[in-house]
Amino acid sequence: RSCSGRRLEYRRVRTEDPAPELCLSSNGRRGPGANVGTVTDTPDLYTTAGKIADLRRRYDEAVVSAEAKAKEKQHAKGKMTARERIELLVDPGSFVEFDEYVRHRTTAFGMDKNRPYGDSVVTGVGTINGRTVAVYSQDFTTFGGSLGEVSGDKIIKIMEFALRSGVPIIGILDSGGARIQEGVLALSKYGEIFRANTRSSGVIPQISIIMGPAAGGAVYGPALTDFVIMVDKTSQMFVTGPDVIKTVTGEDVGMEELGGAYTHNTRSGVAHYLAEDEDDAIDYARTLLGFLPDNNMAELPTYSSDFEFETTDADRTLNTLIPDSANQPYDIHTVIERVVDGAEFLEVQPLFAPNIVIGFGRVEGRSVGIIANQPSQMAGTLNIEAGEKASRFVRFCDAFSIPIVTLVDVPGYLPGTDQEWTGVIRRGAKLIYAYAEATVPLVTVILRKAYGGAYIVMGSKQLGADVNLAWPTAEIAVMGGQGAVNILYRGEIKRAEEAGEDVAAVRTRLANEYTYNVTSPFLAAERGEIDGIIEPANTRVSIAKALRALRGKRAELPPKKHGNIPL
């Protein structure tokens, strides 16, 4: 009741409305952990009790009631709400929300009649396995998750908080793009977000989880982060949509084909993991974070490990891995799983440029980055896509002081006009630049082929690798035996043809002689080009010992503002 004794009707009010003479009954507590009651008494907003009651009412409107409505909408689509996604991502009960009471200030197009608390994004901090992370999650049930002035400010604020605090930031995107009612104000926030992404790059890990659409300017934020996770049949990313493309170019393309999760995981290389569903996407992000430090100055996470320095039966299986025929493939994952602790390897971009494998593992409980040629895909050759995939990974590992282990079996660069015309020289040079610039511990093991320029590019000693080892099956040369025969033994081949000899047999004999006399790893070892030749079974232990010796590595680049990588 009011002071005059009139019964007042409960209603929600905007902040600009006069303070209502409302209060909550003793059982009408609102807020975290409180029971939602009914309004029966008159509050006195000039008293502490009345102000607390008003806070509870506003919290109910901003969080409790808003979340109930969001669940109804999102669950009908088989999706989680923005807050549910955060709760699944962080440790139970650890999330602390920021800015849940902010509201947009737009009055155009009737926007002043719809000013929900929190706007279109939920931000805050929580923990993942006890480690603090900053999080923002766009709310598609509020203005389609569109970015406006206030929601943009919320995202920028949490990004700046993460940078100041030195903690990773994870963005969960589900947005229709810029809020057209706010015009340039919305666009300007994209620019500020991009700048914040760039300033944070190499300082704190940045992970983007795409849970819905991301169009126009919204796509460049994730592209500036370190890892992009997309959900199959749910996520889309594109600069211009199918309708615009149809109008301008006449091309008829669907949303999934244009910018779906599968497209960006297999063709464009924008995404780093194709998740089956939202749970899988969040689980991958949590697992990924377990390999990364909080920031570029922090120590790597270390886990207990029962590392065995004696050769095991599993180690000995590597002695029979390499086929006798140099042209017969094998799966490089077998080697990786023997090298890392517990055979646990988190692959990054497994569907893009599969001829090179990158990802994270642990050796003696410490994180390492793995880069390896894949002989079972395109014979392990390097091409533009593989070079760019690996170079970006090298630079990430170097930025966060994650040691790099390189496993080499590369016959060379993929030949062809398509590669040459699309810039294999310039784009292939990125991997050279990345390795040569890296100051983290670099350990390289040559398993089989290491031919030509591709050998130099793949973490060679000449580019600065600290420890270079080789298996006895390694072949290190300008080119393989078959290619060398065509150049070095052209006369002998011609004479064999004229004499009616078995040319194929002659070629094989000459190729074998070249392989033995020129490509043998012992020749490279004699000249100090590699540091040792090891039995395959000793690979795991040899890598562990090398990394242990390099823990105190100190290396500095010449003073400069920044280099000019061949972008």
Label the model's feature ranges.
Residues S4, G28-R29, T249, L463:
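A generic structural signal for secondary-structure junctions
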Residues R1-C23, N27:
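Short, charged/small-residue-rich alpha-helical element at the C-terminal edge
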Residues P32-A34:
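Long, contiguous binding/interaction regions
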Residues V36-L567:
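Ligand-binding clefts of soluble mixed alpha/beta catalytic domains
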